[in-house]
């Protein structure tokens, strides 16, 4: 693997699994993590992926700056997938982006947006995380 086949998966757990199994993922499949997890002042996700795809998996960087936000993302991603019976959680991703300072906009039918209580909960979850790890999450509204 790496000489005749290139692995590209959208989740960083593959990088850790590759280290265990003796292969190195050389590229990262496009995902929403870089713009949901990073800010202009703290681009830890991009730094981690850049290094990991060159074979330098920095456990300390991941555990300190990325694991908490990844766990929050997994909680919301899985919850929204269950709620929508398997649809990608586009409304959650768009609103998360808004909380990170980007324009998200609304989803198109037949998808439904987050309820106000879900928006409030996600904003609160991100705010709590920001307070715990200031360099990870940008200001939330």
List where the protein language model places each region.
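Long, low-complexity C-terminal extensions of enzymes
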Residues: 109-141
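Catalytic alpha/beta core domains of metabolic enzymes, predominantly
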Residues: 1-77
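Conserved short secondary-structure transition element at the edge of the structured enzyme core
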Residues: 67-109
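Conserved, mostly hydrophobic/aromatic
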Residues: 60, 93, 122
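A structural signal for well-ordered alpha-helical scaffolds and beta->alpha junctions
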Residues: 62, 86-90, 115, 119
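Glycine- and other small-residue-rich loops at beta-strand/loop junctions that grip anionic moieties
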Residues: 8, 34, 82-85, 111
């Amino acid at each position: 693997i790496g000489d005749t086949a290139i692995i590209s998966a959208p989740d960083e757990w593959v990088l850790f699994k590759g280290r265990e199994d003796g292969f190195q993922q050389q590229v990262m499949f496009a995902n929403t993590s870089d713009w949901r997890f990073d800010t202009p002042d703290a681009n830890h996700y991009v730094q981690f992926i850049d290094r990991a795809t060159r074979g330098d998996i920095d456990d300390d960087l991941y555990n300190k700056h990325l694991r908490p936000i990844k766990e929050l993302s997994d909680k919301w991603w899985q919850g929204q997938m269950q709620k929508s019976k398997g649809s990608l959680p586009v409304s959650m991703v768009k609103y998360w982006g808004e909380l990170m300072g980007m324009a998200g906009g609304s989803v198109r039918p037949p998808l439904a947006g987050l309820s106000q209580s879900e928006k409030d909960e996600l904003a609160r979850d991100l705010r709590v995380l920001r307070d715990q790890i200031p360099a990870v999450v940008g200001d939330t509204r």
